[in-house]
Swiss-Prot record:
Binding, substrate: 138-142, 171, 184, 188, 278
EC number(s) on file: 2.3.1.234
GO CC entries: cytoplasm
InterPro entries documented for this protein: ATPase_NBD (IPR043129), Gcp-like_dom (IPR000905), KAE1/TsaD (IPR017861), TsaD (IPR022450)
Catalytic reactions on record: L-threonylcarbamoyladenylate + adenosine(37) in tRNA = N(6)-L-threonylcarbamoyladenosine(37) in tRNA + AMP + H(+)
Keyword annotations from UniProtKB, A to Z: Acyltransferase, Cytoplasm, Iron, Metal-binding, Transferase, tRNA processing
Cofactor(s) annotated in UniProt: Fe(2+)
The name this protein goes by in its record: tRNA N6-adenosine threonylcarbamoyltransferase
Function comment: Required for the formation of a threonylcarbamoyl group on adenosine at position 37 (t(6)A37) in tRNAs that read codons beginning with adenine. Is involved in the transfer of the threonylcarbamoyl moiety of threonylcarbamoyl-AMP (TC-AMP) to the N6 group of A37, together with TsaE and TsaB. TsaD likely plays a direct catalytic role in this reaction.
Provenance organism: Clostridium botulinum (strain Okra / Type B1)
Listed Gene3D superfamilies: 3.30.420.40
The protein's enzyme class: transferase
Keyword Membrane recorded: no
Length: 340
């Protein structure tokens, strides 16, 4: 095998169009991201059809910019990695069809990547010496998992949400208290002005034999609290509501993740996904894990949100295992972690 494997990666699962050039799964030569946040902000959330159209408009330019920044041409690329699920089916298809076209035209192998595996692999970029096994908390707008990573590309899901994802709950609560979209960063910001102990919102407690999450109850409790306040004509302290809600979500995430580490006797937690940027989650996880002698690894913001560099990293580890993807692959919006 060549000393350096160069992956051109494409990501378009939701509302970011991204392309990157990644060498050997850990060195990022370029990571171009065209965000659609300002486009969807006026709608209060991502509109799938609008997202797809925006991807179509920019994907060619984004891929070319990624190659140019890396000072590469397609001749320098060994394989093309692309997200094929989970995500919005229309958005996924834009990136997938573009990648398939490149693979067909150049004869380069195609490697389909699970978006969640990409989030986990972002840690290999930031932490060059990181190797499995380790625990990973994946928290994003559409997904919440506790994953035991046994080896590269080998996962055991120990816990997952039974209803709303953590990021989805953040967005819905932010909308309810008038903060708008995107909800996660706005709740994080206003919470710094509030009292996290002002309101006691419930935590979902399942039996001890599961590490699953449930955030719909917390979300409903917030909505009920707001409705009661409005019916009584009482003033609502948005900062207190946001801080109390945030604490209830973070407490559950941290508690279950530490329990997972104890069950597998691992001393390393990696965090992945957009909600990993939340300052309360970062601070609480680091503080509580320190008490247990557990190391916490959290990538920088640019690698927490959707990006193609993480897809390039995951694609590399698939590539060296000899895995290749047929050009007749289709988008799988509900793709499960570990499915091939």
């Amino acid at each position: 095998m060549k000393e350096s494997i160069n992956i051109l990666a494409i990501e378009s699962s939701c509302d970011e169009t991204s392309a990157a050039v990644v060498v050997n799964g850990r060195e990022v030569l370029s990571n171009i991201i065209a965000s659609q946040i300002s486009t969807h902000e006026k709608f209060g959330g991502v509109v799938p059809e609008v997202a797809s159209r925006k991807h179509i408009e920019v994907i060619s330019a984004v891929v070319q910019e990624a190659l140019d920044e890396a000072n590469f041409t397609l001749d320098d690329i060994d394989a093309i990695g692309v997200t094929y699920g989970p995500g919005l089916v229309g958005a996924l298809l834009v990136g997938l069809q573009y990648a398939k076209g490149l693979a067909f035209a150049t004869g380069k192998p195609l490697i389909g990547v699970n978006h969640i595996e990409g989030h986990i692999s972002a840690n290999f970029i930031e932490y060059k010496d990181l190797k499995p096994p380790f625990m990973c908390l994946v928290v994003s707008g559409g997904h919440t998992f506790i994953v035991y990573m046994k080896d590269y590309g080998e996962f055991e899901v120990l816990g997952e949400t039974r209803d709303d994802a953590a990021g989805e709950a953040f967005d819905k609560v932010a909308r309810a208290i008038g903060l708008g979209y995107p909800g996660g960063p706005k709740i994080d910001k206003i919470s710094k002005e509030g009292n996290e102990d002002a309101i006691k919102f419930p935590r979902a407690n399942f039996h001890n034999d599961t590490l699953d999450f449930s955030f719909s109850g917390i979300k409903s409790a917030v909505l009920n609290y707001l409705n009661k306040k409005e019916m009584k004509g009482e003033e609502i302290n948005k900062a207190d509501v946001a801080a109390s809600f945030q604490k209830s979500v973070v407490d559950v995430l941290v508690d279950n993740t530490i329990k997972a580490c104890m069950s597998k006797k691992v001393d390393k937690i990696a965090v992945a996904g957009g909600v990993a940027s939340n300052s309360c989650l970062r601070e609480t996880l680091v503080r509580e894990c320190k008490k247990k002698g557990i190391e916490v690894l959290i990538p920088p913001f640019i690698l927490c949100t959707d990006n193609a560099a993480m897809i390039g990293s995951a694609a590399y580890f698939e590539y060296i295992k000899g895995r290749r993807t047929s050009l007749d692959i289709n988008a799988v919006p509900n793709l499960k972690l570990g499915e091939r």
